[in-house]
């Protein structure tokens, strides 16, 4: 029997979303945990599935906050890495009146795209029923190469 139902690799970041206006009429922003792969895991965890996350955050206070939120949700964080040089990725989210959203990412680079192949524990892939990854991991070379490395058929068997 496999240890996990789903393991996800990808971005874990802060989504800043508008939460009202200040007394001066300026937009007030709220910091929320974000990143599609972890969002998927959080919902699966609520459905009683065993989940684990593989990714990277900054060693800053935001990265530590995210690690705590993910762990508190019951998601295994043994493969969550911290980058001491690159900050946690930020996304500013604008929601339109029709509910559509627009994202502005602040990562050049961001910690989530700095997960290298040598930081990925291949054994966890063999111990899961399903491996999920986010598309943003494919947009930057370091994280793309890590994903390609871990996704090779010999590692997924």
Predicted regions: what is each one?
Residues 44, 139-141, 150:
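Low-complexity, intrinsically disordered/propeptide-like segments
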Residues 148-157:
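Single conserved hydrophobic/aromatic residue that forms the stacking wall/gate
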Residues 1-76, 115:
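Glycine-rich phosphate/adenosyl-contacting loop at the front of the ribokinase-like
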Residues 3-5, 89, 102, 153:
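A residue-level signal for beta-strand positions that form part of recognition/binding surfaces
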Residues 50-135, 140:
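Conserved N-terminal subdomain of the carbohydrate kinase-like
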Residues 145:
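Glycine/Thr-rich phosphate-binding loops that ligate phosphate moieties of nucleotide
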């Amino acid at each position: 029997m496999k240890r996990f139902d789903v393991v996800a690799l990808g971005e874990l970041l802060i989504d800043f979303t508008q939460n009202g206006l200040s007394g001066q009429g300026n937009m007030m922003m709220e910091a929320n945990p974000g990143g599609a792969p972890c969002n998927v895991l959080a919902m699966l965890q609520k459905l009683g599935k065993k989940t684990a996350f593989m990714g990277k955050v900054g060693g800053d206070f935001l990265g530590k906050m995210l690690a705590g939120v993910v762990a508190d949700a019951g998601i295994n964080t043994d493969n969550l890495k911290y980058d001491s040089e690159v900050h946690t990725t930020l996304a500013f989210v604008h929601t339109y009146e029709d509910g559509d959203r627009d994202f502005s990412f602040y990562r050049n680079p961001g910690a989530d795209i700095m997960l290298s192949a040598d930081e990925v524990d291949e054994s966890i892939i063999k111990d899961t029923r399903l491996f999920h990854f986010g598309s943003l991991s494919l947009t930057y070379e370091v994280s793309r190469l890590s994903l390609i490395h871990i996704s090779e058929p010999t590692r997924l068997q």
